[in-house]
Amino acid sequence: MTRYASMVLANPVPGREDVFNDWYTHVHIPDVLTIDGIVAATRYRLVAQRGGDPAIAGFSYLTIYEIETDDLRGVFRTLVTRMGTALMPMSDAIAPERAFYDWEVLGPRVLADPAGVAAAAGAQGMPDTAISEESA
């Protein structure tokens, strides 16, 4: 099965941020996760922009959906068919301008090795407490 990351950039309607966030977290994501192949979702709020693509500069919220399927178009067909129905009601608190980017996963998720980080920190004269679990 092929793995994908689908990025959705969105904004709330001005003055409706609380309604937008409540709907997105408690209604929309659970609805999207009922679609076969969409296995996880994580939401993010922009805290800083350090250059990059000006086309996405106006968005404050990002959701990354993890998808596992051999039929990506079929997953999106189901998603589009359900949007705005009782199976996936949309909110008037989401601004109509959105951006969608889909990526194929090329390798496994790589995690830092705490022992390796500690060894490197010690070699650089950094205190081990700077990378302890308590401070992470």
Which residues make up each language-model segment?
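Macromolecular interaction modules
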Residues: 1-136
